[in-house]
């Protein structure tokens, strides 16, 4: 288990959805389509000459080492060095990302954060994932004048119909408990 105790869950939803989107487009197999080794310099020179629209006055020499220059001075690496982070993680399809995000990550949220609901929204998160938004109590914050009101403030998520009862229970009890007890079933032993 790994907890991000500050920052809420909205950023995690964005990261998760973004990675799912990128996984389909930027996996190793698809990235091969953009591998500079696969560029046909002869064909590219022909296209520049044909469609250069006055910017190219003659057909470029595809054998000129300056003809094809990569942005930022990028060089053509060996094929063996081309890799993608998702492939290195063993992600074969976008659905595999759910198994990384859903079971092991916990996202600490403040009581008054309306974006807590994003973590529980199966319609919003790809593949129906529920990211573990958890009540990371802001009782000790300098801007909380009365610590007895924090949980009631969190309950406003139900009153505003941002969370249902089950999600609220997961938010304030189940997920914070799981964070510790899932790794150590005796974590709370002797506390009651």
Predicted feature locations:
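Mid-to-C-terminal alpha-helical segments outside catalytic/metal-binding sites
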Residues: 10-11, 50-98, 103-132, 141-192
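Active-site glycine-centered loops adjacent to acidic/histidine catalytic or metal-binding residues
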Residues: 138
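Divalent metal-binding pocket/active-site signature
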Residues: 1-44, 49-54
């Amino acid at each position: 288990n790994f907890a991000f105790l500050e920052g809420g869950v909205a950023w995690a939803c964005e990261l998760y959805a973004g990675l799912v989107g990128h996984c389909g487009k930027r996996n190793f197999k698809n990235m091969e389509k953009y591998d500079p080794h696969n560029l046909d310099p002869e064909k590219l020179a022909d296209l520049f000459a044909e469609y250069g629209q006055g910017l190219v006055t003659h057909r470029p020499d595809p054998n000129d080492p300056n003809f094809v220059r990569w942005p930022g001075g990028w060089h053509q690496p060996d094929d063996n060095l081309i890799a993608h982070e998702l492939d290195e993680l063993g992600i074969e399809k976008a659905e595999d990302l759910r198994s990384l995000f859903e079971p092991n990550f916990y996202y600490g949220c403040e009581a008054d954060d309306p974006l807590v609901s994003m973590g529980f929204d199966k319609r919003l998160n790809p593949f129906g994932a529920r990211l573990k938004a958890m009540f990371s109590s802001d009782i000790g914050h300098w801007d909380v004048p009365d610590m007895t009101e924090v949980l009631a403030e969190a309950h406003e998520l139900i009153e505003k119909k941002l969370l249902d009862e089950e999600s609220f229970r997961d938010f304030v009890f189940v997920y914070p408990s799981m964070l510790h007890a899932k790794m150590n079933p005796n974590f709370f032993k002797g506390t009651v």
